[in-house]
Regions:
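Pocket-lining segment of extracytoplasmic ligand-binding domains
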Residues: 107-108, 189-283
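Periplasmic-binding protein-like
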Residues: 125-135, 221-249, 299-300, 337-347
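Secondary-structure end/capping motifs
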Residues: 250-329
């Protein structure tokens, strides 16, 4: 209607005779056309780099093909992928707005949602279970054998800690009395400790660090697959990592989010199908030290892309288990529905496009 008035097809007086529904429909169509006109002549790819943080390890292995796509011109966006050794390095940057998105542990996302009063949203599940108990020796064959032992682990306050504690309790062990858990900030520190140990050392490690450690030390063996142990006592999906976005960024850039999720899905698909290419990228970017390690570990890393209702169902069930075991694991309370990113309405997209074009 707005464009029709401008073009002289409908006079202002005639436009007033349209019923409210027709007015609304005409207005929406006009807004869409206006956005299209504003977009004419602009590049299909945004010139703004999307700043994404990831941890060295499995949760970022599904992201690396974004860089390959960017190089060959098939990516919808430009990406600035930043790597960190520990999640607590990412959190302050995300809170300050120095990052747009991040791949972080699932429970940390819930905690951060509470801490920022809804300042982040989860867009996708990126990694399922990747944790294992490994031993340098042959004394552990079940959870019962862990009693009285020291366990080295990474991830205090995130998935490794809470999964280990949950499974110890489910198998009749008190994690505060029956075992001693020593935490290190990075998985690479744990593998170094295991390599230096003479015998009978025990650790909880994620892939690809399990593979890396075994390639260096043939005496290291996997004694417990924690995903299998989880499935034995729990009917929910074990989730290691999720990909989150700052809520304000998502509101202002719905088209960027849609383009990212399309690219991300392709990147994850490539990670599971093009093992050699992804392994080379993992070494190039620094996600894994050597391509040979990544190549052997990738099939065991449970890299996925799950969004929408499937994502919400899996994450909410997983967080419920953690909450029941320890409310602190998810920030003191379960996140509400706004925690889960959903595609905005057409009107919201149009208004965001108009707002951005005016900048």
């Amino acid at each position: 209607m707005v464009l029709q008035i401008f073009c002289g097809k409908i006079s202002p007086n005639e436009s007033e005779e349209l019923n409210p529904m027709k007015k609304l429909t005409s207005l929406l169509l006009s807004l869409v056309l206006m956005v299209s006109v504003l977009a004419c002549g602009a590049s299909a790819k945004t010139s703004t780099k999307v700043r994404i943080a990831g941890l060295k390890g499995p949760t970022t292995m599904g992201l690396v093909n974004l860089l390959s796509m960017e190089k060959d011109g098939t990516a919808s966006l430009d990406y600035d992928l930043q790597l960190y050794g520990a999640a607590d390095e990412i959190v302050p940057k995300l809170i300050k707005g120095e990052l747009d998105m991040a791949a972080i542990p699932a429970n940390l996302a819930a905690t951060l949602y509470q801490k920022t009063n809804g300042g982040i949203q989860v867009m996708a599940v990126n990694t399922l279970g990747v944790l294992y108990v490994v031993e340098k020796g042959n004394t552990v064959h079940s959870f019962a054998d862990l009693k009285g032992r020291t366990i080295l682990s990474t991830g205090k306050g995130t998935t490794p800690e809470y999964v280990l504690r949950y499974l110890l309790k489910k198998n009749g062990l008190d994690p505060d009395k029956d075992v001693k858990i020593e935490y290190y900030s990075e998985a690479s520190e744990v593998t170094a400790q295991m390599a230096a140990a003479k015998k009978d050392a025990i650790a909880v490690l994620p892939q690809p660090y399990v593979t890396a450690a075994q390639m260096k030390d043939s005496d290291l063996r996997v004694v417990l697959d924690l995903t299998r142990e989880w499935n034995r006592v729990c009917d929910t999906q074990l989730i290691t990592g999720v990909t989150v976005v700052r809520t304000e960024y998502a509101k202002q850039n719905p088209d960027v989010i849609a383009a990212f999720l399309t690219d991300y899905q392709k990147s994850v698909k490539a990670a599971n199908e093009d093992i050699d290419g992804t392994a080379a990228l993992c070494e190039e970017v620094g996600v894994v030290a050597k391509a040979a390690i990544a190549k052997k570990a990738l099939p065991k890393c449970n890299i996925v892309y799950r969004n929408g209702q499937e994502m919400k169902k899996d994450i909410s069930a997983y967080l419920q288990v953690l909450y029941d075991a320890s409310p602190a694991a998810v920030g003191g309370k379960l996140p509400d529905d706004n925690f889960y990113y959903t595609e905005p309405s057409v009107l919201r997209k149009v208004m965001a496009a108009i707002r951005n074009s005016a900048k």
